Amino acid sequence: MNNRVHQGHLARKRFGQNFLNDRFVIDSIVSAINPQKGQAMVEIGPGLAALTEPVGERLDKLTVIELDRDLAARLQTHPFLGSKLTIYQQDAMTMNFGELSAQLGQPLRVFGNLPYNISTPLMFHLFSYTDAIADMHFMLQKEVVNRLVAGPNSKAYGRLSVMAQYYCQVIPVLEVPPSAFTPPPKVDSAVVRLVPHATMPYPVKDIRVLSRITTEAFNQRRKTIRNSLGNLFSVETLTEMGIDPAMRAENISVAQYCQMANYLSENAPLKES
């Protein structure tokens, strides 16, 4: 028996498809999402509707974004969900979530079992729309969830941690074994809740500057910041900000990265592109 086939659909490697089939896990995720009628619920990657069906049962309308043409067609003819669904057959990386929120007249509640091969770039895409999003619940590779929630002074702490925590409160929900999927992935999975901050705890003047600093620092994470960020900050400047130049990227808090970004915005702003 081909373990890549589930409900008559062959899981496609190029789309990173692993289909959730464990009823206990599905019920736990739906309980965590807690969908309510009247909310602008949006599912990314509904696949074979493991989450779509129990969430859709509670709603009058549900928006789904599915790249796979065959799966989108199956959803259109779903026996009891079809009439409730608005289906976008496209890559979620190309979706303008700000426009979708304006169309639906309220902030979005986004959820999904995300393809692991695009989960990190998709996170960054969604972060740019957090003013249009109420919350997000995602199944991800456990290692990615560990990176999202990691704090300074840990190996998992990186650029994704800083940017996620800049935009959102990040809350791990539950861990999921490979046996909950068809085909079983080679890694453990986990569900995470991301809630955009109502008020930014560490507002930055130019998000591009924060992005640049974190990229340069973590691309050379074994170097001290006097070296990795030496082209942006002098030792004296770092010391004046109360930041030890001998620290490495993983030792610097989100608040300190934001402090550095604001200093640079005020003293060496990026040119408009």
Swiss-Prot record:
Gene3D superfamilies in alphabetical order: Ribosomal RNA adenine dimethylase-like, domain 2, Vaccinia Virus protein VP39
HAMAP family per record: 16SrRNA_methyltr_A
Organism: Salmonella choleraesuis (strain SC-B67)
Entry keyword set: Cytoplasm, Methyltransferase, RNA-binding, rRNA processing, S-adenosyl-L-methionine, Transferase
GO MF annotation, one: 16S rRNA (adenine(1518)-N(6)/adenine(1519)-N(6))-dimethyltransferase activity
Annotated family: Belongs to the class I-like SAM-binding methyltransferase superfamily. rRNA adenine N(6)-methyltransferase family. RsmA subfamily.
Protein purpose: Specifically dimethylates two adjacent adenosines (A1518 and A1519) in the loop of a conserved hairpin near the 3'-end of 16S rRNA in the 30S particle. May play a critical role in biogenesis of 30S subunits.
Record bears the keyword rRNA processing: yes
The organism's taxonomic lineage, starting at the top: Bacteria, Pseudomonadati, Pseudomonadota, Gammaproteobacteria, Enterobacterales
Stated name of the protein: Ribosomal RNA small subunit methyltransferase A
Enzyme class name: transferase
Keyword Phosphoprotein applies: no
